[in-house]
Amino acid sequence: VPGTAAIANAIFDATGVRFRQPPFTPDVVRAALNPPPAELARPPRRRKGGLATFGAVLAGVVGVAGAIIGLRPAVEPVVHTDPSIYTAVTIERGRQLAAAGDCAVCHTAPGGNPNAGGRAMATPFGTVYTTNLTPDPETGIGHWSFSAFQRAMREGISRDGKHLYPAFPYTAFTRISDDDLMALYAYLMTQPPVRAQVPETRLAFPFGVRPLMAVWNALYLDPGPAPTDAARSAQWNRGAYLVNGVGHCAACHSPRNMVGAEQGGRRYLGGAMVDGWEAPSLTAQSHAPVPWTEGALYQYLRHGHTEQHGMATGPMGPVVKELATLPAADVRAMAHYLASFQSAASPQQAAATAQVLVNRAETRNALLASPAQRLFDSACGACHRDGNGLAQTGRNIPLALNSNLYSEHPDNLLRVVLEGISEPATSELGFMPTFRHSLDDRQIAELAGYMRQRFAPGRPPWRDLEAAAKRIRQNPSTH
């Protein structure tokens, strides 16, 4: 644990007790968070009342120590560096890294200047506002040295010594190499400075006590660049570096525990809810009706759609826009790495499965004559026709292949119906109107239920669709 000597000295000054081994090491804390199965109940042994007192004092000491170890020194400010010291090659490399990391996606407020911060990010602990990444000396990072920038990316510590919250995914960025961090720093420092004071992040107690993040980091942060896997190919390692490092895919696609840390193991990339959208599993646990192949993953990440799964909408739309500016080899490496978590289906097998699903949906049409079908025909038929994917305006994937219809959660489908698609990942994908003002919650629920029954007949009906439609209507997304 960083600052062990300082903690021990502080405890000695306060209590007169000298600890040779602090009682709050990461192993001890992990053991407390994950206790072993309880043994059979035994009659309690009588202890002196002082044991409870000692436990209370120890708990207090741990809390104080957490605050002590959270104090980090500030890095001295520097005069804004002359941008001409960086080569065009370095700056372009930094631009690509910023695109892979979607820096502008999170650090740009709606209608604001790129990277000037201020976007509100809802978390279970409160709203986090993204910071100004432009080289403005007063409100941005203009006074940040490279060492300050590196510390923030590797350790989650701001230039002034304050802890950053893991809504800024430094647990992934810590894996970025020194050379790439320097290139990213060079790119950011050569962008136009924007004076923009962002709102202050205030989280509920105790999450708003930033020094306590030192304990969180001791448990969940593994600082330093990630090593390569010698047993894997160069392409696989490049993909792993981009996905798990600057791309921080797990920040959205892995579920988090009760204190906001990404879960690994079988839950790695296993899907999660982010900003009201479902970020689906990127592994073989995916609810997609057609297995993802390496080619389909590349097509989706590069162009924002695949004929066997659907289109990138919601938060993935801006991600695809950024990935489209990367070298094709990098996107292929990401697809290659992600494909290693999928079932081994060939492109021919995937195509055959897709055709079966489309044919099944067409034959079920006559069996489902109902008011909901008439609602679908009037609201959706102009573009989607009979759900068979005939293109009217832009790309149109058969609804029987749309992954959202096979999910356990109706949220993504309901959001698209209510909010439409006003900013597609690419212009060729086309737009979709919003039905927020033309359909009420009951109609939205009937429409979603019909689409689930017809186009994903093997899946159980969604429950409480009207309540879900009302909830989503009242909580619009920021993407």
What residues fall within each predicted segment?
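Cofactor-binding beta-sheet edge motifs in enzyme active sites
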Residues: 1-69
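Hydrophobic, well-ordered secondary-structure elements that form the walls
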Residues: 7, 11, 16, 383, ...
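Ser/Thr/Pro/Gly-rich low-complexity linker/stalk segments immediately outside membranes or between
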Residues: 69-93
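Flexible coil segments in periplasmic/lumen-exposed cytochrome c-class electron-transfer proteins
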Residues: 76-81, 108-126, 159-240, 244-245, ...
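Short extracytoplasmic
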Residues: 86-121
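Aromatic- and charge-enriched surface segment that lines or borders ligand/interaction sites
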Residues: 139-157, 161, 174, 290-294
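C-terminal structural cap/anchor segments
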Residues: 371-409
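Extended, polar beta-sheet/loop recognition surfaces of beta-rich domains
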Residues: 399-442, 446
